[in-house]
Amino acid sequence: MTTQQLHEQILQKKSFLCVGLDPDLSKIPAHLLETEDPIFEFNKAIIDATHDLTVGYKPNTAFFEAYGIKGWMSLQKTINYINENYPDIFTIADAKRGDIGNTSSMYAKAFFEDLNFDSVTVAPYMGKDSVEPFLAFENKHTIMLALTSNEGAFDFQTLNTNGTELYKQVLETSKTWKNSQNLMYVVGATKAEYFADIRKIVPDSFLLVPGIGAQGGSLSEVCKYGMNDKIGLLVNSARAIIYASKGTDFAEKAREEALKVQQEMAEIIDSKF
């Protein structure tokens, strides 16, 4: 999927919502545990209930890998279901990979060729040669950690080195890499006060923004400082939507929560565009 196609989906749906798929067998409704593949059945119901309100789904691979080969098969069934039934939806493998070049090449092949995700999250700590293998894939997107939503982000990401915070150096440096047009960036919603500075460095890039909902980030603040002239945001919400209910009405309640976010987004889009 191209960024232009993603932008068109955002305008059509008046939504830049991304729903995180973080299936936890201890939290999903009990009646699903009796099915052959509870994780897939849970994801499928959430997807069917919210697909018209969201432009993206972000399976967090840890929540699948934790269940071994069965979990990985559930991930494959989930991405296949999205691609076959809702091909206009942008898909993100939230895997946070990043290793030496030949290893990153295999990670990229796994997520872009075998699983056929539109994008994957990566950690840039090992530098250019750990990220560029992902960037080589046409119309695939590498979403690089820039400034994350967790408290530990301040341990390293905002450290001042050579007169500039580390996260700013990461952003500036990544712009010089081959195929950098395929980069997007993770910026946490709980760091809204940093968005203005980030937009000065990467004014045109899409930002994946976790931290809305259960983590307490403000959508209005994120949009005030982070939105560009093509919107340029994918705002993720997971727990507040997918775990809105533990009953048989879980998918219906998930839709209600997703609709609340989408309606707020529609108001913002209508006021700005």
Curated annotation (Swiss-Prot):
Keywords: Decarboxylase, Lyase, Pyrimidine biosynthesis. It holds the Pfam family OMPdecase. The active site is at 96 (proton donor). It catalyses: orotidine 5'-phosphate + H(+) = UMP + CO2. GO terms for molecular function: orotidine-5'-phosphate decarboxylase activity. NCBIfam families: pyrF_sub2 (TIGR02127). Belongs to the OMP decarboxylase family. Type 2 subfamily. This is Orotidine 5'-phosphate decarboxylase. The lineage of its organism: Bacteria, Pseudomonadati, Bacteroidota, Flavobacteriia, Flavobacteriales. The gene is pyrF.
